[in-house]
A protein has these predicted regions:
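Flexible, acidic/Gly-rich N-terminal and inter-domain linker regions that tether
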Residues: 1-160
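Conserved, mostly hydrophobic/aromatic
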Residues: 109, 177, 352
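Short glycine-rich or small-residue beta-strand-to-loop segments that form or flank ligand, phosphate
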Residues: 167-168, 222-225
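Iron-sulfur (Fe-S) cluster-binding segments and ferredoxin-like electron-carrier domains
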Residues: 180-193
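Short cysteine/histidine-rich metal-coordination sites, predominantly Zn2+-binding motifs
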Residues: 193-201
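Conserved AdoMet/S-adenosylmethionine-binding subsite of the radical SAM
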Residues: 202-220, 229-384
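C-terminal accessory regions of radical SAM enzymes
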Residues: 375-403
Length: 403
């Protein structure tokens, strides 16, 4: 009887124990080169002359951060004039005179700016406009470039997608970003923009809750503004519980830039954190998801303080996702975006979206081409796990939605 030739040949071992013969064995990596794990824990704020005597306990107090926020060009000048020349100061003053957003910067952010190279710094570009860098606005620009108000059945509630609503609960933030899509409503009036009023009033909220309760197709709600960091603890509970009590609402998220620009609030505002935790826990018991969405844009925004704050949220079972804005000179280089995504993953923040910069007045110097976004996304894919790789999207002008 003939022997089956396949059975006659012994199978070569799949695993080769001789590591020297494995062609693609990766070399050992110097731990110091894994930069996304090296989060600064120094007293970086003491480089600012005005805060050189501020101790760690004081700096980590969210009330101190709020009290000492930079809220005017004059206050900014007083704080940084020893670090920069008069030409830079004049440039900033010219920038704010032409900007659609009021001035508000937390000490945490201001201290993270590299004041040796402020013109090129990725954090400075997001928060401090320079007159010398402002470019002519895009010809298709409108103040509400995404058409949010056109899809608002009641003031401050946008219902664009079939099963999702955007609830703008208030119109203030702990900082004001240059690139804010809602510069038509957020913050104080400026020389350039008279704002739409979206105050946190009972009457306006009631109209929004009534609409959402009557639209049975709604399952997903984004609570934004403004910024949910500015909600009081009882407001967090009220909004959360009223949404949880609507049977067809299955999930919602509080949107806040807070963890990126004032992470110490999570560590020291116990009432706010407890209120958020209560809503998340109640939602989980009902089979509903409540999450926190935040907005880190540059690796330098992620510090040891960020890690401590996100660690507290992680321990409490609160999911945190990140939505970045793709900006020229901030995060439009592949290496920067890889570093950002890995740092976020390292502190248990899920990189979720990267938005191509919207049409916003006074920010053409920050906008990139869509093609540049495609290039960076291609480089980012494969650099880390797929579930830690953000999706790049364009929110089309005029109300077209995400693409």
């Amino acid at each position: 009887m003939a022997t089956n030739p396949v059975e006659a040949k012994p199978t070569a071992p799949i695993v080769n124990d001789d590591l020297e013969r494995i062609t693609h064995l990766k070399p050992q990596v110097d731990p110091a080169s894994i930069s996304w794990r090296n989060l600064r824990r120094d007293a970086f704020w003491q480089r600012i002359p005005a805060w050189q005597d501020v101790d760690e306990e004081t700096f980590l107090d969210h009330k101190w951060q709020e009290k000492n926020a930079i809220t005017s060009p004059a206050k900014l000048v007083k704080t940084v004039q020893e670090l920069v020349g008069s030409d830079f100061i004049a440039d900033v003053e010219a920038g704010f005179a032409a900007a659609p957003m009021a001035v508000r910067i937390s000490p945490y952010v201001l201290a993270l700016i590299d004041w040796e190279t402020p013109y090129a710094d990725g954090l400075r570009r997001q928060f401090l406009p320079l007159g010398s860098q402002i470019e002519s606005d895009h010809p298709m620009l409108t103040l509400d470039s995404l058409g949010e108000q056109a899809d608002a059945p009641v003031p401050g509630l946008t219902h664009r997608y079939p099963d999702k609503a955007l609830f703008l609960v208030l119109d203030t933030c702990p900082v004001y970003c240059r690139f804010c899509t809602r510069s038509y409503a957020v913050g104080l009036d400026t020389e350039e923009v008279e704002k739409v009023q979206l105050k946190a009033t009972r009457a306006r909220w009631d109209r929004a809750f009534k609409y959402m309760s009557e639209r049975v197709e709604l399952e997903d709600v984004v609570i934004s503004g403004g910024d949910a960091y500015r909600l009081k603890a009882d407001q967090i509970r009220e909004i959360g519980n009223r949404l949880l009590d609507i049977p067809h609402i299955r999930r919602f998220r509080f949107a806040t830039k807070g963890p990126a620009i004032m992470p110490m609030k999570v560590l020291t505002d116990h009432d706010w954190l407890d209120a958020l935790t209560e809503v998340v826990d109640r939602g989980r018991s009902m089979g509903k998801e409540v999450a926190l969405h935040t907005h880190f844009n540059h690796p330098n925004e992620v510090t040891g303080i960020s890690q401590d704050a996100m660690g507290v949220l992680f321990e409490r079972g609160i999911t945190v996702r990140n939505q970045s804005v793709f900006q020229r000179g901030v995060n439009d280089h592949p290496d920067t975006m890889v570093e950002l995504s890995k740092r976020l993953s390292h502190i248990n923040v899920h990189p979720y979206y990267v938005y191509i910069h919207d049409l916003v007045r006074g920010t053409e110097d920050l906008r990139t081409t869509v093609a540049r976004g495609v290039q960076v996304e291609k480089r980012l894919r494969g650099a880390t796990a797929g579930f830690n790789t953000p999706t790049f999207v364009v929110d089309a002008p005029g109300g077209g939605g995400k693409r």
